[in-house]
Amino acid sequence: MNYARFITATSAARKPSTIRVMTEILSKAPKSVISLATGAPNPNTFPFKTAVITIENGKPIQFNEQMMKRALQYSQSAGIPELLSWLKQLQVKLHNPPTIHYAPTQGQMDLCVTCGSQEGLCKVFEMIVNPGDNILVNEPIYSGTIHALQPLGCNMINVSSDEHGIIPDSLREILSKWKPEDSKNPKKNSPKFLYTVPNGNNPSGNSLTAERKREIYELARKYDFLIIEDDPYYFMQFNKPWAPTFLSMDEDGRVIRADSFSKVLSSGLRIGFITGPKPLIERIVLHIQVSTMHPSTFAQLLVSQLLYQWGEEGFLGHVDRVIDFYRKQRDALMAAADKWLSGLAEWHVPTAGMFLWVKIKGIHDVRKLIEEKAFKKEIFMLPGCGFYTDSSAPCPYFRASFSSASPEQMDLAFQRLAQLIKESL
């Protein structure tokens, strides 16, 4: 892979931060070293001394004074070593990427910890998107991605999708406007990457099948573009066996994968991780060095302590319990939809994630119905227009989340919505 052609001029100009490099060196230095170089504050001046955090299905996590001093201090930009090590082992267990044993320059698998996967994705976009670049997305698309990409001035080309995710034939038709060799000619402006949420897509709830992923990956090889696999709902797939990931079939080192603990451990701790070819991960870390500097050391240590206590089996056991909860929540929302919205709307049952994507029949644009009328009836959902690059266009869809409401609340919400729809027709 020629990674240089994907890197923006701004990203290519980034150099390692001297102070951040020093932090890395000092973390590996023997304790006998007398450091007069660090700009880190003296931890003895910090007011927080100890903490004990109780854990469901586990022993309390204790931060003694020494651990607390480390937790409150600066740390390495790529992530603390023990968490990086655990996560790399997890990725090998779950995905077994072909690139594990590649040479570093040839796309060897690497990863870094980020302040949630959203930060990681923003760093990826900053690294590879130039104004005018053509990139491939599938609408409806996560609104956070739209708002991250639009200011960068790229051209977002929509690839059609259905309840099984991106339609390969649609992607093939779009790509037919270029020749495979056009990727070597910057003037041809062939697509630089495909962005996709393969499981429980937010907002549509659809999930890519293994067969479609293989077709898409082969097209990526043919036309030489990257795949950004944004998979925050990977640990919320309701049906087993789980479909193989793009990372698991990445023979070329062209997949950048974003994972998150936000949905299964904590959304507020802001711990995510980006996995991909080493030359690109190293460049993402350079972006981190001059922005957030590193994810919260405290949050990383807390998550790391939990994961080492649980082990992989314990963590995946917790994931299964989370899945059981959300499956029941989904089923409750489906029951409410079947009861009240049949004949008034249409939808597909989500196989992952926490969202139901609903199209109201007979109403060209549901924005006013959802934003104003429904809110007056004390039900709150999101109109679908916010998940399209042209948010001003009429849209008959809305997104309903089944993460927090009780089954009784879901039933009441859809009962009220059904009445509003009937009044609006």
UniProtKB/Swiss-Prot annotation:
Transmembrane segments: none annotated. Gene3D superfamilies: Type I PLP-dependent aspartate aminotransferase-like (Major domain) (3.40.640.10). Pathway: Amino-acid degradation; L-lysine degradation via saccharopine pathway; glutaryl-CoA from L-lysine: step 4/6. Keywords: Acetylation, Aminotransferase, Mitochondrion, Pyridoxal phosphate, Transferase, Transit peptide. Substrate binds at residues 20, 74, 142, 202, 399. The modification N6-succinyllysine is found at residues 263, 339. The modification N6-(pyridoxal phosphate)lysine is found at residue 263. Residues 178-208 are annotated as: Disordered. One of its GO terms (molecular function) is methionine-glyoxylate transaminase activity. Residues 1-29 form a transit peptide. It is found in: Mitochondrion. Its EC number is 2.6.1.39, 2.6.1.4, 2.6.1.63, 2.6.1.7. GO terms for biological process: 2-oxoglutarate metabolic process; alpha-amino acid metabolic process; biosynthetic process; glutamate metabolic process; kynurenine metabolic process; L-lysine catabolic process to acetyl-CoA via saccharopine. InterPro entries: Aminotransferase_I/II_large (IPR004839), Class-I_PLP-dep_aminotransf (IPR050859), PyrdxlP-dep_Trfase (IPR015424), PyrdxlP-dep_Trfase_major (IPR015421). The modification N6-acetyllysine is found at residues 69, 179, 263, 339, 422. Homodimer. Belongs to the class-I pyridoxal-phosphate-dependent aminotransferase family. Transaminase with broad substrate specificity. Has transaminase activity towards aminoadipate, kynurenine, methionine and glutamate. Shows activity also towards tryptophan, aspartate and hydroxykynurenine. Accepts a variety of oxo-acids as amino-group acceptors, with a preference for 2-oxoglutarate, 2-oxocaproic acid, phenylpyruvate and alpha-oxo-gamma-methiol butyric acid. Can also use glyoxylate as amino-group acceptor (in vitro). This is Kynurenine/alpha-aminoadipate aminotransferase, mitochondrial. The gene is AADAT.
